[in-house]
């Protein structure tokens, strides 16, 4: 078969593993949001957000539906959400959101990854970020999007049009109202539709290639952990 075949097979296996991990993360988020706030996304902000996020990430419909059915059926499985803070190479601030059935395991694994990859798991950096509702999509004109938002008197923080992509930032509590207005525009596909943490100040630029590689390795290792849902940072990569 040759080395080329081995490389392709390894690449396909890695892609399949990432897809499986993404499906698992989405299922946990949807299950917990539905269990805690009800299975109707129209009245459950958290559920609406994670479903939209799953769709934007191309999570299969059956994964979404099974997670909601599990919550509706009174499944006893329980997960706890936590946010961990740390510092990476070049003093980059890092937030790690987890959803786990074993808090001690999650905390220990996160500390281990930081310690083994030139990071500090004891940094306090949450104040450098804010949680916002974020949307991104193509094939719509800025004027019509603004008109839809203004007609509904929806509060947003910013609207950016860049490379034919419209990006909207809004207070995280305004997620449902913004999404309701955007739905009237019949947007075909959202590139981003979720609540996420973003840096309050300008991102840190890392010019040294080795340092940048060290940081990317740390971020990748954190993202690969079973209990990790999201990893946020304030670096320019």
From Swiss-Prot:
Keyword Membrane: no
Location of the protein in the cell: Cytoplasm
A molecular-function term among this protein's GO annotations: DNA binding
GO biological process: regulation of DNA-templated transcription
Stored Pfam families: TACO1_YebC_N (PF20772), Transcrip_reg (PF01709)
Keywords: Cytoplasm, DNA-binding, Transcription, Transcription regulation
GO cellular component, as recorded: cytosol
Keyword Ribosomal protein on entry: no
Family statement drawn from the similarity comment of this UniProt entry: Belongs to the TACO1 family.
Protein name in UniProt: Probable transcriptional regulatory protein MCAP_0598
Lineage: Bacteria, Bacillati, Mycoplasmatota, Mollicutes, Mycoplasmataceae
């Amino acid at each position: 078969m040759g080395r080329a075949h081995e490389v392709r097979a390894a690449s396909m296996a890695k892609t399949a593993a990432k897809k499986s991990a993404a499906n698992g993360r989405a299922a946990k988020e949807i299950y917990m949001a539905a269990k805690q706030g009800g299975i109707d996304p129209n009245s459950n902000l958290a559920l609406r957000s994670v479903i939209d996020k799953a769709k934007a990430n191309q999570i299969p419909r059956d994964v979404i539906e099974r997670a909601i059915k599990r919550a509706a059926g009174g499944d006893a499985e329980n997960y706890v959400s936590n946010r961990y803070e740390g510092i990476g190479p070049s003093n980059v601030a890092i937030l790690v959101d987890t959803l786990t059935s074993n808090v001690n395991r999650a905390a220990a694994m996160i500390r281990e990854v930081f310690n083994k990859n030139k990071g500090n798991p004891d940094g306090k950096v949450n104040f450098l970020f804010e949680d916002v509702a974020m949307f991104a999509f193509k094939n719509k004109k800025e004027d019509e999007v603004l008109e839809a938002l203004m007609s509904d008197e929806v509060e947003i923080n910013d609207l950016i049009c860049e490379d034919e992509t419209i990006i909207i930032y809004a207070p995280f509590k305004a997620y449902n109202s913004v999404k309701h207005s955007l739905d009237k525009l019949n947007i075909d596909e959202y590139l981003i539709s979720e609540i996420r943490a973003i840096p309050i100040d300008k991102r840190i630029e890392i010019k040294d290639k080795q340092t940048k590689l060290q940081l990317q390795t740390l971020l990748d290792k954190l993202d690969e952990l079973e209990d990790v849902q999201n990893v946020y940072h304030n670096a320019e990569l």
